[in-house]
Structure formats: structure tokens, C-alpha cells
Amino acid sequence: MIGGGKTNSGVAVSEFSALRLPVVYACVNRISNPIALFPLKMYRTRPQGGKELVQQGTGRGQHPFASRIGVRPNDLMSSRTVRKTCQAHALLWGNGYVEIERNGRNQGLGLYPLLPDRTAPVRENGDHWFRTTIDGRRHDLDPDNVIHIMDQSQDGFVGISQIAMAREAVAMGLAMETFGAKFFANEAKSGGFLMHPGRLGPNAQRNLTKPNGEKVSNPENPASRLDDQGGLENAHRIKVLEEGMKFVQTTIPPEDAQFLGSREFQIAEIARIFDVPLILLQSHEKTTSWGSGIEQLMIGFIRSTVEPWVDAWEQELNWKLFTDEEKEQGFYVKFNMNALLRGDMKTRADFYQKIFSVGGFSPNRILQLEDEDPIGPEGDEHFVPANMTTLRRASDPNFQPDPNAPSALREDDPDEIEADARAERDAA
């Protein structure tokens, strides 16, 4: 944690105060939401190849945490809440921590997020563990029982906080928020000065007030109040000088005219830290960096920004959640990102048609990718050309295709199909 120290702009910045800046809040949301949205399921590799979905249970090939990991990893929180909370911690503090609850057989049974400002990895005398504080009590946790999601790191043990790295940029954003708010609180006027050729008399000194209307505590030295009337906290307020007063209206300098432009630049500066495209932050940017549409931009965002975080989650979960025996049996968890990466309907239909026609995907596999129910065991067959027969029949030398069978996924002329069938019969 940065500790909320002052920056060059005079604004204190911490991970908590940074969230008050809309662009920071939006960036954290844009990255955390997909992590929380992707289905998270437990699988087991088959000895003969492929994979199978692990069922909830305690029998062979089953796991007591199989269905709960993607739905309810603990009794208090949904899977979405746990993942979004920990991911937000990693984005703000640079480190997200989740404690693994285990049963007597050392199997993972629950996941509980830990506060990042009260948790840290510890290394002493060659040993490594995590130290956390819960309800005022300190606990030392085995490193195998803590999922540690971190961003860039200098030593490989502690992640670097993005807010710490961008504290000046965040502080400028907060300062401009306050500056603009004060401007409108002062009736959208930039204020002015009361000037006098002499010194303030005793009565005028006693009548000096602070910006909030409170009487000045030391009227004998009115000049001491001048410093307190400046700064960001008192932006746009009227400044009191010496006696012989006259009011001088200040004009808006050219720099003030660039206020909106400065705010846009600051949004872009912070978005770069989190690697989020401006268009996803409802910015005024009119062009995209990937392709010509929002779909390609979203795919690029998932690939370049979200997928590295998904990989960090999968590596930590697969290494620490399972026992050595479960790892040998092929247990693993995986995020399903197909929902946001599979493209539009036309693109998917073209892809499925091509890969189906060469025996790559079965009908059930295509339905699975579309989150639809399978059509039954017959949908597991793979098909190849020659009137789209199955691979088993195509490999049988005694099998003769039916020339009257419909040619699936083809748009050939019917006369050409009949001619092809006649040629096959003549050759036989």
C-alpha cells in the first residue's frame, strides 16, 4: 500500500482514494468483470486422450469441490464475488490473495479472499510463508494454501501496485476533479481580488473570515491568512489583500480553456497503466486500434489484457488447489473464454462448417461451444466428405456410400451431385 502520501500536486493518493477517480474505477471494473464472468470448471484428462468434466463427489474421478469452485467457493460468497474481489485487489495493490480451505485429505474445499493491505509474503532463513491479520489477530499461512495473483514484480514474490507506479497521474486526475468541482461551487466564476492601497483597519481585521465563514483566529496578522486562501482547497474563491480595497475580476486564462482536454489526457494516461482501450471507458476516442468494429476490439482486449490475468489464475489454482495425487490423475481447472472470443454468428458458422467438413468437430462439440444441449450419442460422430459419411464408415473398404444421401453443408448444383454419384457407381 502506498500509505496515502502527498504527491507533487498536493493530493494524497492511496489505493482506496484512487477508486474515487472514475477512470480508475472503470478500469478495475473492465478487467475484473470478465474474470468474474468466465465459467470456471474442473476437468480431468482421460488416459486415452481428451478431457472430461469432473463431477461433485468423493469417489474415484470425482472431487468434493468440483461444482462449488465455479458457483459457491465458500458459504458467504459466490464464485463471481471471490474472483472479482481478488482481481480488483491485484489491480489496485498489485497483489490479490485467496486462502484455500482443505479437508482431512488435504483436498481443497473452499476459497476465501484476504485483505491485500493486511497480507504479505514473508521470507526468512530460506523459508517462505504468508502473513495476514484477521480481526486483529496475526496468522501465518502455508504458501501452498494461498492463491497469490500478482502483477509485475521486481523480486517474484511481491507484485508492484499500479496505483503506486501511477500515483502522480492519479493525483492529477483527483486534483482536476476537485478543481472543477470548486469552480462550479463558486457559480462557475473564477473569482477575483479585493484590493486596497493601505492596510486594513482594526475593524476590517476583526471582520476577516475564513472561506467557511468562521472568524479568523489571529486578526492581528491578516497577512497570515493569505496563504490559507490559496491552493486547490480554495480554488476560485475571492482573495483578500490589503486595505484600500477594490474588486478586480480575474479572467479565465487560456490554460483554463484546456481544462476538458487536460482531463481527457489524464484519462488516457491512467488507461495506459491498466492497458484498457479508451473506447471501453466511454471516452471520446473515435477510432479503434484493432480492426474496424467493437467486436474485434473486444477480442483484442481479452487477448492482450484479460488473458494474462486468466493465465495467472489458472497456474496458481492448478498448482496449489490439488494434491499431488490429484495432479497425477489429471485434475485441473480452466476458465472458458469462448463466450467472449468466439466472434459473431456468421464468422462462427463459417468456422464450424469448415472444421466440421474435415472431421474436426462433431455436431455435439459444436453445440457445446454454443452452450447448447447435445443431440445424443449419435452427435459424437465425426464426418468427412463423400456425402458426409462418418470416419468409421469412410475407413471401411466394403462400405459403399448411398448416392441418394443428402450432401450436408454443401451448396453444389444437384445435377453435379447426381453426376458424381453415377461416376462412382460406374467405377465400382
Locate predicted features.
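Short flexible/disordered coil segments
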Residues: 113-114, 129, 300-311, 344-357, ...
